[in-house]
From Swiss-Prot:
Catalytic reactions on record: [(1->4)-alpha-D-galacturonosyl methyl ester](n) + n H2O = [(1->4)-alpha-D-galacturonosyl](n) + n methanol + n H(+)
Glycan-bearing residues: 52, 81, 94, 281, 300, 416
Localization per Swiss-Prot or TrEMBL: Membrane
Tissues where this protein is expressed: Expressed in flower buds.
GO cellular component: membrane
Name of this chain's protein: Probable pectinesterase/pectinesterase inhibitor 21
Family of this protein: In the N-terminal section; belongs to the PMEI family.
Bias-annotated ranges (Polar residues): 616-628, 654-669
Entry function: Acts in the modification of cell walls via demethylesterification of cell wall pectin.
Location of region: Pectinesterase inhibitor 21: 52-205
Keyword Glycoprotein appears in the UniProt entry: yes
Membrane topology, from the record: Single-pass membrane protein
More details: The PMEI region may act as an autoinhibitory domain and prevent untimely PME activity during transport.
């Protein structure tokens, strides 16, 4: 069907109004995630007709949400009877900002009254996470002033990532009270109830917008454009030269050199970080020479575009041993915590040496959006790598551990990585992954491409009593896709392990595609309702280009990168061949259609230290809803080992329909 110029122009203007109004509403909604309870007060009547019109406007805005009453009550009580969505948002935003300040003061007061050290840490952790949510709100609100129609697709994708991260912040706040004394945890849970509901509502509205825009198939909405050389615009000329170099620091002098032998400017990483420029928009490179660095490192939110380059994952090692058993929250046990966006690490080892007996002990926690890890090693036992939130890419890395050693709520892709199972405590099971998606609309999940699952010799000696599984659902909508990966015989025929009873078995999203090895057979896999069989079209949506918009920010970083499907997948991509050399212990794979399924050898050897630049073509596609077939549920595999469990999420949330809500969009026509 064709439209005249006036109709088309009007239609585009309407899309813009819809988007701006909705996005602003979401910004307001997410601000509330810092734990604000909005003041309750009775407003003077402005006239029955005016009130009715305002109530209708609020109801239309709240139509797609799961917690509709919370949405409506919040806007009606603070909306000054306006029918303008923009004014509703501005009013609520101003009220929320004031309440954020009040809530921060209140949390500080509660913390000062606590005697239990774990409770005090949990409250301080909540305060930190609230601060992150508020910062993200402010940045997103400012960016709305730069809104352009052709950037609509990018805006919606980023907002879904941001709202997913906000949900992670809320959940992590409450998780910190596990094992605490007193009622501080229940107090915070009640304080955050409305905020949590409003955040899920915000994600519902943005998801509705994404579905609507996707249906329209409007040309010109693929927004993020690479420069002619194939680099994102934020990578400056010096950074491009550095990241292209065969040896990452051979022809470009790093900004800072850390060396324990005194040959650099600083002997510790933390000393060096004091001199990293704040809120920098260009790359800042820290070369960390060989050595065992026993220190706890935090790349805070002001350290964006930071690059760590080591001398090899077995030579440059950052080591710690904080753990849950010694009274520290899981979130705070990380040896290295990375919050600043656009972080890159190459040729570095990270470890937590607390041991299996100390339970949760994180080596690295990653909250950095568009972060990259190449030729790195993450060693630990339980909860080794905490991929907390945002978009992350891991290439040629090794992750070792015992229980849930790869967990979190990030949208993370792992290419050509080794997942190395270690010996746990006697008779403990070893589920490898535990993804923590709380809402089905979150654009998060784990994707493994061309990886290898292997076991250390000590584990192989006890594999009959310490059974390994691909993963288990940490949260109700846990999502993990494993494709073109070598699965050994010690992975149980059931494949997946339940968390507790039937928790999440109907709502999780697990799929296995074109895997190899003696443990890859699907005949005896669990048949929970959440186990998915993906079509060829669906599989493409979980490749890096589409799933984490990787074509926008990974190419040109000196990191091997396969944009689409690997060889051996149905309809394997042919756009971007991976020209990198294979890491020792792995088979080379390319994007060549028609090749046999890859079967990388099970050696966990590290990849070469040299950085390799890649050719790149292609553009990112927006994430879209995926329809999958599901099988019937059967009895669960053997019971999960005893471990601190997560509270069951609230009532099930229906997956957003691809059909737009008529009442929601009618108010903008």
């Amino acid at each position: 069907m064709s439209y005249g110029y006036d109709d088309e122009s009007k239609r585009k203007r309407r899309y813009i109004v819809i988007t701006i109004s909705s996005v602003l509403l979401i910004s307001m909604v997410v601000a509330v995630t810092v734990g604000v309870s909005l003041n309750k007060h009775d407003g003077d009547s402005k006239g029955k007709a005016e009130v009715n019109a305002s109530v209708k406007a609020v109801k239309d805005v709240c139509a797609p949400t799961d917690y509709r009453k919370t949405c409506e009550d919040t806007l009606i009580k603070n909306g000054k009877n306006t029918t303008d969505p923009m004014e509703l948002v501005k009013t609520a935003f101003n009220v929320t900002m004031k309440q954020i300040t009040d809530a921060a003061k209140k949390s500080q007061t509660i913390m000062e009254l606590q005697k239990d050290s774990r409770t005090r840490m949990a409250l301080d952790q909540c305060k930190e996470l609230m601060d992150y949510a508020l910062d993200e709100l402010s940045n997103s609100f400012e960016e709305l002033g730069k809104f352009e129609f052709h950037l609509l697709d990018e805006a919606l994708i980023n907002l879904r990532i941001w709202l997913s991260a906000a949900i992670s912040h809320e959940e992590t706040c409450l998780e910190g009270f596990q094992g605490t004394q007193g009622n501080a945890g229940e107090t915070m849970k009640k304080a955050l109830k409305t905020a949590i509901e409003l955040t899920h509502n915000g994600l519902a509205i943005i998801s509705e917008m994404s579905n609507f825009v996707g249906q329209m198939q409007i040309p010109g909405l693929n927004s993020r454009r690479l420069l002619a050389e194939g680099f994102p615009s934020w990578v400056d000329q010096r950074g491009r030269k550095l990241l292209q170099a065969a040896a990452a620091y051979s022809d470009v002098k790093p900004d800072i050199v850390v060396a324990q032998d005194g040959s650099g400017q600083y002997k510790t990483i933390n000393e060096a970080l004091q001199f990293v420029p704040k809120k920098r928009n260009t790359t800042f490179v820290v070369h960390i020479k060989a050595g065992l660095y026993k220190e706890y490192v935090q790349v805070n939110k002001t350290m964006s575009h930071l690059v760590f380059i080591g001398d090899g994952p077995d030579k440059t090692i950052i080591s710690g041993n904080k753990n849950y058993k010694d009274g520290i929250t899981t979130y705070r046990t990380a040896t290295v915590a990375i919050v600043g966006n656009y972080f890159i690490a190459k040729n570095i080892g990270f470890e937590n040496t607390a041991g299996a007996i100390k339970h949760q002990a994180v080596a690295v926690r990653v909250q950095s959006d568009e972060s990259i890890f190449f030729n790195c090693r993450f060693d630990g036992y339980q909860d080794t790598l905490y991929t907390h939130s945002h978009r992350q890419f891991f290439r040629d890395c090794t992750i070792s551990g015992t229980i849930d050693f790869l967990f979190g709520d990030a949208a993370a892709v792992f290419q050509n990585c080794t997942l190395l199972v270690r010996k746990p405590l006697p008779n403990q099971a070893c589920p490898i992954t535990a993804h923590g998606r709380k809402d089905p609309r979150e654009s998060t999940g784990f994707v493994f491409q061309g990886c290898t699952i292997a076991g250390e010799p000590d584990y192989l000696a006890v594999k009959e009593t310490s059974k390994a599984y691909l993963g288990r659902p940490w949260k109700e909508y846990s999502r993990t896709i494993i494709m073109n990966t070598f699965i050994p015989d010690f992975v149980q025929p059931q494949g997946w392990q339940p968390w507790l009873g039937d928790f999440g078995l109907k709502t999780l999203f697990y799929s296995e595609v074109q895997n190899t090895g003696p443990g890859s057979a699907l005949a005896n896999r669990v048949t929970w309702a959440g186990i998915k069989t993906l079509s060829e079209e669906d599989i493409l949506k979980f490749t890096p280009a589409q799933y984490i918009q990787g074509d926008d920010w990974i190419p040109g970083k000196g990191v091997p990168y396969t944009t689409g499907l690997l060889a051996g997948n149905p309809a394997a991509a042919t756009t971007t061949p991976s020209v990198s050399a294979a890491a020792p212990g792995f088979s080379t794979f390319t994007d060549t259609s028609g090749a046999d399924s890859i079967a990388p050898t099970a050696s966990p050897a590290a990849s070469p230290e040299s950085s390799i630049s890649m050719a790149y073509t292609g553009t990112a596609s927006p994430e879209s809803s995926i329809k999958v077939s599901s099988s019937t549920e059967t009895a669960s595999p053997e019971s999960s080992f005893t471990e601190a469990s997560t509270a069951s999420p609230e009532s099930s949330i229906m997956v957003a329909s691809t059909e737009s809500s008529g009442s929601f969009f009618s108010m903008f026509t």
